C-alpha cells in the first residue's frame, strides 16, 4: 500500500541480506528519465500501469533481489500473474492515518483525486485488502512504534522462521546486522 515504508524497509532488508535492491517507482523514473508522476499527470493511469507491467516482467526474472513494488501493483492481476511464485511477497500493513501522514509528505498522484486523502486511501484499501493479503506470504504490521532497523530485524526473523534461507545465508546476514 502506498506510504507503508516499502522503500525504506526494502533498502535495509536488502543490505542485511547482501542482495541488490530495486524499487518500482525508481525504475519507472529511470526508464522515463523523469518522474513517473509526470507520466500519470500527462498520460493517465493506463500509461502508468502499462509501464508498471513491463517493469514487473523484468522483476520476475530477477533472483535474490529485494524489490519494492508500487503501492497498487498487486491490485492488477496481470502483475500478480507474472510475479506469483518468483519470490516471497511481504505485505507491509499500516493504519490509514499513518499512511495518510506519510503520503501527505510526498508528492504522490492520487487514485481518487476528488476526495480527501484519507477517503482516497480508505477506498483503495477497502477495494483491494483481500488482494494485498492474498498475494502476501508474510504480513507485517509497521505501526508498532519500532524503528526501521527493528522492523527489518522482525521481517528477517519471520523469513528465517519460514525457513527461507540457508544457514550460510543467515550467517552472512548476521554479519550485516543493522544497529
Roles of regions detected by a PLM:
Residues 85-130:
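A glycine- and Lys/Arg-enriched "phosphate-lid" helix/loop adjacent to the NTP-binding pocket
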Residues 7:
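Walker A/P-loop
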Residues 65, 88, 137-138:
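Well-ordered beta-strand positions
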Residues 23-82, 109:
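ATP-dependent small-molecule kinase phosphotransfer cores
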Amino acid at each position: 500500500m502506498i506510504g507503508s515504508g516499502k522503500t525504506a524497509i526494502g533498502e535495509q532488508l536488502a543490505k542485511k541480506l547482501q542482495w541488490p535492491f530495486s524499487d518500482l517507482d525508481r525504475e519507472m523514473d529511470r526508464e522515463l528519465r523523469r518522474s513517473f508522476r509526470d507520466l500519470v499527470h500527462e498520460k493517465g493511469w493506463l500509461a502508468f500501469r502499462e509501464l508498471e507491467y513491463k517493469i514487473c516482467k523484468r522483476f520476475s526474472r530477477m533472483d535474490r533481489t529485494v524489490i519494492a513494488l508500487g503501492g497498487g501493483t498487486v491490485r492488477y492481476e496481470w502483475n500478480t500473474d507474472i510475479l506469483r511464485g518468483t519470490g516471497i511477497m511481504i505485505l507491509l500493513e499500516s493504519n490509514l492515518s499513518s499512511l495518510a501522514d506519510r503520503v501527505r509528505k510526498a508528492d504522490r498522484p492520487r487514485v481518487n483525486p476528488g476526495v480527501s486523502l484519507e477517503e482516497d486511501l480508505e477506498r483503495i484499501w477497502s477495494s483491494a485488502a483481500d488482494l494485498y493479503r492474498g498475494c502476501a506470504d508474510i504480513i507485517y504490521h509497521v505501526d508498532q512504534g519500532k524503528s526501521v532497523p527493528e522492523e527489518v530485524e522482525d521481517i528477517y526473523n519471520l523469513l528465517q522462521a519460514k525457513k527461507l534461507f540457508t544457514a550460510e545465508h543467515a550467517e552472512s546476514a548476521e554479519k550485516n546486522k543493522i544497529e
